[in-house]
Amino acid sequence: MTSPKQASDDIRFMGRAIALAKARMGQTWPNPAVGCVVVREGEVVAEAATAPGGRPHAEEQAVPAAGDRARGAVAYVTMEPCGARSSGRTSCSHFLIDAGVARVVVAAVDPSPFASGRGVERLKKAGLEVETGLLAQEAAVLYEGYLHRVETGRPMVRISDDGEGFDARFAA
């Protein structure tokens, strides 16, 4: 059972990971902007967000930055760590396992072919404690466009119905 302090810390650190991801929104295409915060004994030892252009991934930066302090730590990740990579490089789930992270808290499961539950499954099989869905509503808003594109194959387009912001003319 999670203690009230642990639950409060989880929310705080996931909130930080979401803030890191938000700061990179629109810069990481074709990948989603992901935030990762590595915490050991209540102290942030490393944090990162997906780099512009989509590489390297957040975990791929944060885990090496944490170094030996990643062993036994908790990683707060806004989206499920990838379970495979199109480039053949090490997956983010492997980075977390190899570093000795003890627990991974994930806001949103990634429906893409490179994750789709495989990242979480790989972490669990390796003996890591994994929790999903923390701040899921905030993550759903953050990843609305990405999730739409993965699920439909089309970009999400919103047209404002704000008459003041729309400045176009249509002819018959």
What kind of feature is each model-predicted range?
Residues 1-6, 170-171:
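Catalytic cores of nucleic-acid editing and processing enzymes
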Residues 6-29:
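Short, basic/aromatic recognition patches
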Residues 18, 32, 43, 112-113, ...:
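Flexible, active-site-adjacent loop/turn segments at secondary-structure boundaries
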Residues 19-26, 68, 128, 144, ...:
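Generic secondary-structure signature for well-ordered alpha-helical cores
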Residues 28-42:
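N-terminal glycine-rich anion-binding loops that anchor highly charged ligand groups
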Residues 30-34, 56, 153-155:
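Short, basic and Ser/Thr-rich N-terminal targeting/leader segments
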Residues 38-140:
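Zn2+-dependent cytidine deaminase-like catalytic core
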Residues 144-149, 156-172:
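Active-site ligand-binding patch in enzyme domains
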